[in-house]
């Protein structure tokens, strides 16, 4: 009932949020390892430039990896017991050579 825009937007947001979560946990694990392995180098309070770069990089990589979801999903009309239903699926035949 929401159309092709929502059909493409929901899988895109799902994939992007999973990517952001996984990459953030990886970055957190690396940061905690560095803090434990070299505890004498812990600096003062604040957000270092490298941390800000990591956060931006995590978001950019996650969004870029989620783009194929937005491209591939589409509203498909299917015949089911004599009635036609429009459902949101990964399109079985892609229109571009990308996928």
Curated annotation (Swiss-Prot):
It is a multi-pass membrane protein. Keywords: Cell membrane, Disulfide bond, G-protein coupled receptor, Membrane, Receptor, Transducer, Transmembrane, Transmembrane helix. It comes from the Eukaryota. The keyword Nucleotidyltransferase does not apply. Residues 1-8, 77-99 are extracellular. Disulfide bonds join 7-88. InterPro entries: Endthln_rcpt (IPR000499), GPCR_endothelin_rcpt (IPR051193), GPCR_Rhodpsn (IPR000276), GPCR_Rhodpsn_7TM (IPR017452). Residues 31-51 are cytoplasmic. One of its GO terms (molecular function) is endothelin receptor activity. It is found in: Cell membrane. Coiled coil: none annotated. GO terms for cellular component: plasma membrane. The chain crosses the membrane at residues 9-30, 52-76. Its main location: membrane. One of its GO terms (biological process) is calcium-mediated signaling. Non-specific receptor for endothelin 1, 2, and 3. Mediates its action by association with G proteins that activate a phosphatidylinositol-calcium second messenger system. Belongs to the G-protein coupled receptor 1 family. Endothelin receptor subfamily. EDNRB sub-subfamily. PANTHER family: ENDOTHELIN RECEPTOR TYPE B, G_PROTEIN_RECEP_F1_2 DOMAIN-CONTAINING PROTEIN. This is Endothelin receptor type B. It comes from Macaca fascicularis (Crab-eating macaque). The lineage of its organism: Eukaryota, Metazoa, Chordata, Craniata, Vertebrata.
